[in-house]
């Protein structure tokens, strides 16, 4: 038996906590015997003194075990259970292709995803632009669709990592969000509760990333890899670029349309293709479905070419309540905005820089994202045909096409697009799509 205030005092005084002490505190949060004040004090003590790697592992495991941990053994999957998590960005639609591609190669991907908040788009919001798609199925349906389609992308249920929900709500109002120990435990507790065999983290870098600098992104990636492996789940991370919109589109229905076109081969944005392939290949190698990256990429290209990946996506959509003919008739099902017209550059030169966060907020401003969690979403609005950094620009060059509900909304978005794309006389230095891979042995 421990006293909560003694645990808080130890952390306040920068004394390392034991796994039992951390577990006691987190169980108290889940059972609601800890007050909000105690949670806030605990979070602030961690914020100022941080945690050792052993403490981070203990915190993550305690939060994971605060609710249901899914056990897939009764499903008799004949392949590894794998997943990917992204720190989020703009036009980051990789999950919608990655899940089906890995499934088509023999993996099982029970992906529990989130909604968009702030400038980042949410995978669930994108999928809910598909009529009938149910993001909150029963556990039995979740398991059955994962088995039948190889992939099921759904929302977090209340019984997964409930302690994280309380801790996060307190962090949000006490200025303790941006601490790597707390971020690591929050991300991993939810992911590891899904009963994964292996995980790949996509940690974004750049103007649209969650972390403010390359170094901070790298520190987070290293923390997640070390802690997840310490908690018993084989995990690697890729640092990928978010200095510009990743896909050609930003906006819910627009991104789903692009994902379908990617899977069917109708259109594949080169940067989106490279990042998606890199993440998928990492998942195949991690889980033993491929012996090396080269073999993995060959397998992935094959399931794109032969249509197996597209079939898996179609099965998932139908299995979760969406149209059975979605892949064939997606354009009829996805909502369209009344206005779709380009915004042109006002000067000549090169697309030199993007404030990707600002472009994401332009989509939010149109109703395509949330300012607060209770906001409703307009699935049709957004940006498409995004210009790429390094492209030559003149006054006849479209920076993007804006999909809006009214002329006034279009004009407001056009102003935001122009303000967040820098045109310069010189070409920018190219940035890699994938900066580096981080594995347990690299730390």
UniProtKB/Swiss-Prot annotation:
EC annotation from Swiss-Prot or TrEMBL: 2.4.2.4
Gene3D superfamilies: Nucleoside phosphorylase/phosphoribosyltransferase catalytic domain, Pyrimidine nucleoside phosphorylase-like, C-terminal domain, Transferase, Pyrimidine Nucleoside Phosphorylase, Chain C
GO terms of molecular function: 1,4-alpha-oligoglucan phosphorylase activity; thymidine phosphorylase activity
UniProt keyword rRNA-binding present: no
GO cellular component entries: cytosol
Reaction it catalyzes: thymidine + phosphate = 2-deoxy-alpha-D-ribose 1-phosphate + thymine
GO biological process: pyrimidine nucleobase metabolic process; thymidine metabolic process
UniProt keyword terms in alphabetical order: Glycosyltransferase, Transferase
InterPro entries: Glycosyl_Trfase_fam3, Glycosyl_Trfase_fam3_N_dom, Glycosyl_Trfase_fam3_N_dom_sf, Nuc_phospho_transferase, PYNP-like_C_sf, PYNP_C, Pyrmidine_PPas_bac/euk, Pyrmidine_PPase_CS
Record pathway: Pyrimidine metabolism; dTMP biosynthesis via salvage pathway; dTMP from thymine: step 1/2
Disulfides per UniProt: none
Enzyme class, UniProt record, top EC level: transferase
Highest rank taxon of the organism: Bacteria
This protein's record includes keyword Transferase: yes
Assembly: Homodimer.
NCBIfam families, per database record: PRK05820.1, T_phosphoryl, Y_phosphoryl
Family designation: Belongs to the thymidine/pyrimidine-nucleoside phosphorylase family.
Function: The enzymes which catalyze the reversible phosphorolysis of pyrimidine nucleosides are involved in the degradation of these compounds and in their utilization as carbon and energy sources, or in the rescue of pyrimidine bases for nucleotide synthesis.
Protein's UniProt name: Thymidine phosphorylase
Organism: Photobacterium profundum (strain SS9)
């Amino acid at each position: 038996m421990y006293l909560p205030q003694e645990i808080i005092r130890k952390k306040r005084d920068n004394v390392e906590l034991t796994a039992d002490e951390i577990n006691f505190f987190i169980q108290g949060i889940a059972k609601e015997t800890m007050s909000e004040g105690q949670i806030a004090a605990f979070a602030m003590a961690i914020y100022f003194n941080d945690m050792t790697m052993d403490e981070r592992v203990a915190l993550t495991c305690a939060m994971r075990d605060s609710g249901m941990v899914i056990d897939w053994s009764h499903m008799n999957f004949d392949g590894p259970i794998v997943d990917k998590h992204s720190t989020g960005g703009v036009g980051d639609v990789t999950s919608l292709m990655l899940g089906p591609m890995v499934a088509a190669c023999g993996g099982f991907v029970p992906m529990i995803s989130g909604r968009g908040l702030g400038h980042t788009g949410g995978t669930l919001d994108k999928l809910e632009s598909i009529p009938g798609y149910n993001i909150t199925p029963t556990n039995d349906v979740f398991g059955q669709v994962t088995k039948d389609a190889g992939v099921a992308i759904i929302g977090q249920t209340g019984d997964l990592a409930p302690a994280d929900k309380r801790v996060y709500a307190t962090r949000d109002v006490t200025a303790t969000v941006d601490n790597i120990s707390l971020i690591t435990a929050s991300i991993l507790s939810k992911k590891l509760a899904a009963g994964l065999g292996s995980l790949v983290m996509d940690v974004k870098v750049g103007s649209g990333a969650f972390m403010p600098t390359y170094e901070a992104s790298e520190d987070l990636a290293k923390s997640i890899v070390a802690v997840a492996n310490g908690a018993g789940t084989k995990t690697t991370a890729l640092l990928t670029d978010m200095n510009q919109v990743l896909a050609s589109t930003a906006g819910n229905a627009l991104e789903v349309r692009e994902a379908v076109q990617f899977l069917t081969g109708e259109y594949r944005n080169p940067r989106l293709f490279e990042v998606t392939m890199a993440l998928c290949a990492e998942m195949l190698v991690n889980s033993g479905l491929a012996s090396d990256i080269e073999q993995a990429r060959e397998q992935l290209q094959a399931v794109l070419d032969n249509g197996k990946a597209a079939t898996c996506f179609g099965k998932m959509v139908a299995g979760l309540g969406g149209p059975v003919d979605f892949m064939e008739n997606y354009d009829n099902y996805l909502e369209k905005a009344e206005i779709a017209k380009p915004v042109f550059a006002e000067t000549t030169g090169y697309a030199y820089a993007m404030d990707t966060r600002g472009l994401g907020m332009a989509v939010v401003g149109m109703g395509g994202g949330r300012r607060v969690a209770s906001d409703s979403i307009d699935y049709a609005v957004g940006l498409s045909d995004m210009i790429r950094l390094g492209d030559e620009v003149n006054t006849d060059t479209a920076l993007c096409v804006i999909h809006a509900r009214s002329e006034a909304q279009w004009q407001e978005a056009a102003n935001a697009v122009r303000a967040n794309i820098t045109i310069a006389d010189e070409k920018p230095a190219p940035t890699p799509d994938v900066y580096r891979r981080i594995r347990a042995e690299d730390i």
